[in-house]
């Protein structure tokens, strides 16, 4: 069952199995196994949604079963930032080979690697199992379970996600549908975004009026300066 967004955004009920990279809760990736989609959420607003492919063997965190783990994870490492689209990786190293989408007979990890680590007991082996978000040349399989445990994406999509998601970003893999999240305002600065679990902070006029006497507001200083100028002009 998908846990409330307030828990996701607040990150208040998660006890990490081990802490290597600090978790960044202003950046979240939500992956729905049911929808076969990935949603990028930044500062409480939906930035993008991409089709994905999770494991053809189901869900879980079992050694040797090639399943996709569920629960809360985090981006531990990013590999391939300067590699060309379609770059083939073997043991997380660029081989020099580049594949086009739907290249016949090949199914390697390509383009980008976003390596995940588990934050809960139910996904504690994710990092050691090599669970990635990565590109695949088999783009025709995107949108249905077809991977061997990882989360596959189209090359152009995983490259875009790679550039938007920092190390430490929170990742949730859920068996439920993606939650409804409002789109992030495009024209609003990121620093002023309001998360789903927070409200805009406004200052009560009464609090402003009760400020200490030795502290002047900008408006008070402006009025004081204008009054002083008027008095000086009257003396001339």
Segment roles from a protein language model:
Residues 4-16:
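Bacterial N-terminal signal peptides
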Residues 47, 51-79, 83:
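Electropositive
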